[in-house]
Amino acid sequence: MKYQLTALEARVIGCLLEKQVTTPEQYPLSVNGVVTACNQKTNREPVMNLSESEVQEQLDNLVKRHYLRTVSGFGNRVTKYEQRFCNSEFGDLKLSAAEVALITTLLLRGAQTPGELRSRAARMYEFSDMAEVESTLEQLANREDGPFVVRLAREPGKRESRYMHLFSGEVEDQPAVTAMSNMVDGDLQTRVEALEIEVAELKQRLDSLLAHLGD
């Protein structure tokens, strides 16, 4: 597969994909905006504490690889970054809104079950039911230009199998059988996480508004 992202590159791209959908008024992002998004405590696994220089290094590498591009001028006092990873004018990778939501959540949190993905991706795309989540995952796993996700072997004692993206190369865990299983989204933790994400984004918007009022 042609995509070989490091863990930090995956985090940066995932953040830009997320913010493009959830906070479009703040997108593209400055370096500081990317740092804040990368180190966000909600909807991130693992939680990171990257410095500005570490993030800048990743941004520079991704620009060179044509996964990002810089945006400047027209009144912008600082350089900002936008993703060209998917759905860009000249890029090959085209994803639906549902596919973007799942891929982004996998880039930001690693392997997850369909139930977890449905809950955690809700800010980007509202899946009508679990069948739509599973169908989208199956499409990503069987695309001619992919595969982009893989189903992992079910862990002992677990009812659900997890899925992982393949943009960082092959996953060590072996895929289980391809049959889909129906999941019930009743996990309290994922609901709490969804609320935490919403609160964090509201706070970010409020901070941005206060900053504009202070100018």
Swiss-Prot record:
The keyword Acetylation applies. The modification N6-acetyllysine is found at K80. Keywords: Acetylation. It comes from Shigella flexneri. The lineage of its organism: Bacteria, Pseudomonadati, Pseudomonadota, Gammaproteobacteria, Enterobacterales. Belongs to the UPF0502 family. The keyword Acetylation applies. PANTHER family: UPF0502 PROTEIN YCEH (PTHR38768:SF1). This is UPF0502 protein YceH.
